[in-house]
Curated annotation (Swiss-Prot):
The gene is Pex39. Residues 1-26, 53-114 are annotated as: Disordered. GO terms for cellular component: peroxisome. InterPro entries: KPWE_PEX14_dom (IPR040554), PEX39 (IPR039995). It is found in: Peroxisome. The modification Phosphoserine is found at residue 102. Its main location: other. May be a peroxin involved in the PTS2-mediated protein import pathway. This is Peroxisomal biogenesis factor 39. The keyword ATP-binding does not apply. The keyword Glycoprotein does not apply. It comes from the Eukaryota. Keywords: Peroxisome, Phosphoprotein.
Amino acid sequence: MSWWQDMDQRGGVSSPSGALASAEPAPASVTLAELLHLVQKGQEVPGLEKRHITATHGEPTASLLPRRPKPWEDAGSAASPCTIALDTRTQPPTIEERSRGSPAAQLDGGPRVS
């Protein structure tokens, strides 16, 4: 037996506040099959509150809370040790380092010092 057939046999979903609901007139009980039929035909579902939600077209309200810092934004220092270490490894080589590593310097025996 599937869950919707079980719901049909029990007569629908009971409200969580069953004791309080008994004081008020009970809304029309609809089985799941009847509910499906009503929705497919585009008809009103009995006991369902209809909300009228419309756009406001007004200006959005400004946030009252301060902006939270991003995880990589450290309020204490401008650069963390991790970013300093990364910066030193990614620096371009100096002129001396370039001349030692160049193919012309290797063929010629390196830079000459006078």
